[in-house]
Amino acid sequence: MSEKKIEELLKLLSMNNGDMSKLTANQRKEMKEYKFWKTQPVTKFDEEVKEEGPIHEEKTPADIPDEPLPLLPDFEWCAIDVDDEKQLEDVFVLLNENYVEDRDASFRFNYTREFFNWALKSPGWTPDWHIGVRVKASKKLIAFISAIPVRLRVRAKVIDSVEINFLCVHKQLRSKRLTPVLIKEITRRVNKRNIWHALYTAGVVLPAPVSTCRYAHRPLNWDKLYEVQFTDLPPNATKAEMVAKYTLPKATKTAGLRELRLEDVDQALALFNRYQSRFDIVQEFTKEEFIHWFINDKNVVEQDKRVVFSYVVESEGKVTDFFSFYSLPFTILNNSRYKDLGIGYLYYYASDADFKFEDRFDKEGTSLLKQRLSTLVQDACIIAAQNKMDVFNALSSQDNTLFLEDLKFGPGDGFLNFYLFNYRTFPITGGLTEDQHFDTEHRSNVGVVML
């Protein structure tokens, strides 16, 4: 299928919040070219979901083969132990040289060792789920895929699952059909641990999205973004006007705002859990997981290597608000002045601003929450700018559409599709209207954030 056709389908899906029934027969037929996905337990494009739940009845680990899938003779499987510096270095090199680039090959993700340690070593992680493929002769790592355990709530049902991420095949070997083999092998290994469901995301359309969200970008350093061609100068605007438009206050506004500390975790987690209850798909965190994902790694001494930034608002000993964002910079490939672009990503947050209202969409409660989140996320942008980030990204997920436009987040070209493996569910709204604008009225029911 051509890239143009995929984009057209992506646009249609985002307009319909992932509802496959609104695709034409010809569009569905085109999507059937994804032969691999036709063999997998995923919702088909022309399938009418009548009941939520597993697609295949659960087997037992004893039903799953013990041996890994066969590879071409020149390749071999390996388990990557990210506690081993040399093995981590191999993943670092593979992803930084071969992972997602933009179409013009001007930018690509610059994954750091600190980021991998954070993203791949959550509680319950196992080297067996960090799978690599090496060349037998040279031992060069040429492919990678990872899974970490997560506990998902899909509406009222809680399911043990994994989160699949960092699927990467070396550019020169993408004709070898390694991707389907990697997916099948990670599935086999996860099934052997008695887990039968997975959450994953992709920018492309696969069978069949649970939801579709749109990216939004808030410039923090407009002048640099323009110079590296990350953004354009709008018609009838000057550079000085654009810099002035996106200039932020030098100091945060929220009284009682400070970094999240270990002693805050019980209060912050309780606040977070109550806030998350409004969404249809979320990850449920244990206390140990909450500490891992939101308490900054004290072993990272250098501030410029810090990955996650988490803050709470404390009022008279009570935690009333919480927000977090993480850093994942870009490498700039063709610029003599700048080598990297600092990128902040809005992560999870919670506020008690509307807790006294039973209806999430109560007019007064919505107004209070919008005001509170706008202040908190602007403070997040200020802190990100202070930490040398040049742009702040968010999705149309969670309650983000309440503040994106007011805080000068512009809609991006990219969309992110959410998928569930071996689990049927009705479409979940992704915060988009039919014309792909941010849906401030209905917002999103997606409460899970993937890296």
UniProtKB/Swiss-Prot annotation:
It comes from the Eukaryota. Tetradecanoyl-CoA binds at Y34, K35, F36, W37, L167, C168, V169, S175, K176, R177, L178, T179. PROSITE patterns: NMT_1 (PS00975), NMT_2 (PS00976). It catalyses: N-terminal glycyl-[protein] + tetradecanoyl-CoA = N-tetradecanoylglycyl-[protein] + CoA + H(+). Monomer. Adds a myristoyl group to the N-terminal glycine residue of certain cellular proteins. GO terms for molecular function: glycylpeptide N-tetradecanoyltransferase activity. InterPro entries: Acyl_CoA_acyltransferase (IPR016181), NMT (IPR000903), NMT_C (IPR022677), NMT_CS (IPR022678), NMT_N (IPR022676). The active site is at L451. Keywords: Acyltransferase, Cytoplasm, Transferase. It is an enzyme of class 2 (transferase). SUPFAM superfamilies: Acyl-CoA N-acyltransferases (Nat). The lineage of its organism: Eukaryota, Fungi, Dikarya, Ascomycota, Saccharomycotina. GO terms for cellular component: cytosol. It is found in: Cytoplasm. This is Glycylpeptide N-tetradecanoyltransferase. Belongs to the NMT family. The keyword Cytoplasm applies. Its EC number is 2.3.1.97.
